[in-house]
Amino acid sequence: MEVGTVVQEEMKFRGSEFAVKVEMAERLLIVEISDVVTADQWRGEFGPAYIEDLTRKTGNFKQFPVFCSMLESAVHKSSDSVTLDLLTYSDLELLRNRKAGVVGRPRAQPQSPALSAKRYLILIYTVEFDRIHYPLPLPYLGKPDPAELQKEIRALRSELKTLGLRGDHKVSDQETRKLRTELALVRDEKEALAKALDRLQMVGSGSAPGARGLREAVHSLEEQLLKERAKSQRSAIKKSQEQRLLVEQLEELRASERALRIRVKSLTTELALLRRGRATPVLSDRGGLRGDGVVHRSLSRERSLTRVGIRARSGSRERIEDRGRRSEERVRRADSSGSRNCITRPSPSPTGSRVPRFDPTAYIQDRQRRQKEAELKSQRKIRRDMLASPSLMERGRSRSREPVPQLMRAGSAGRGRSVSVESRRSRCSSEGSVAEFEELAKPLNSRGRKLMSNGPAVSRGRHINKKPMCSTPAQRMRAGDTSMDTGADLSEIDARLQALQDYMRDLDTGH
């Protein structure tokens, strides 16, 4: 509120109308209230010190300019936080007692006429959780003097007459016409803006379905994006699983390749040993025993290599132990059957020889053994048929037939019969069919003695040492047959070994 500002409004307090006038003078606030009906007047003048002390006592300090601005806003009713009220002295005391917590109306005390005629203009400042009252005391001035009023009326009339003589009314008419013209322009602009607003509203209402369609399209695209993300995640998981399976299959194939290489190496070693044994004849019993020891050592090495290959091919410990156990059983049976089946025919010697007796117990045991071996053969055949891998089937076929060594004739005619060491080694390394092995591995007497394979078996260590007749035709014929059979077996081994090497080469090319 600036100096020289005068604010005047008509307000209604407790059912009565009052004219409120607030004037800002030099460092002074003047408040004047007059009753519209009775013309009673109340007037008060307040300085900055009084106003600031009053606000400090209420607990909410305000500076003098701020208080004047608050009072102006209350007169104009431009703010809801400040209002005005007009109270008498008794009403003010009642308000104070209510704030102090006194219940009931206080006793009426004798009051002076000045206090009873005094009025209090209350400036009420309302904050969020509190209301502060600033009371301004206004002493009673009484009714206005009629002479003064008439004097004021005359002054106003003269002022009006002076303004009329100066032609101010014409100027005011021009200003009125100008204002009316501006008003018409503003109305035209308003109508144009209203029409533009209507058009915009119509366009907005028409484009609403398009916007809704765009929202639906965006929503559907988001759903498709989520579906594609889920689908890509599932496909990635599936691809990773397939990759893991392929890696496992690759490891299995590499292990199978290593096992096959070990098998090829063992078969190559076996073939070399067979060829070396075929080229080296058995000269004597002592030499045969030494060769037997050497071949037994090579057989032990070959057996260890074969077992290593079996371990590499199969991941089952129980199958390895079962195969080792069956192999050892077959080796022992082959050795025992070889020693039992080597029954020599007596040569025409003048001294004569003892005829072997028929042993029924050995015959029954031999027949039971043959039955068990036939059952084992059928079980192995079923197991081989169930295997789907060609490498396993090839290994099963390569194991099922082993070469039968050729029996070599000794150089000296006076030495005793010796069983072929190569036949014993082939029995130890064979894991195929026992019945086929027995047909191929029937030992021949190097001195022309004929074995009785279908006859009764003789216990180990009861061989009759006789001087064989080297000129016997049957011996030469059997030796030729044995050479032909051994050659055929070696050819078959070579063919199978070549097929296995071709398969290994195909595996290497496939990787």
From Swiss-Prot:
UniProtKB keywords: Cell projection, Cilium biogenesis/degradation, Coiled coil, Cytoplasm, Cytoskeleton
Gene Ontology molecular function: any one: identical protein binding
CC terms in the record's Gene Ontology section: centriolar satellite; centriolar subdistal appendage; centrosome; ciliary basal body; cytoplasm; microtubule organizing center
Major location category of this protein: cytoplasm
A Gene Ontology biological process term: centriole assembly
The organism's place on the tree of life at top rank: Eukaryota
Note: The N-terminal 3D structure (head domain) resembles that of NHEJ1/XLF, PAXX, SASS6 and XRCC4.
Written domain comment of the UniProt record: The coiled-coil domain is involved in microtubule-binding.
Protein name: Centrosomal protein CCDC61
Origin species: Danio rerio (Zebrafish)
Recorded name of the encoding gene: ccdc61
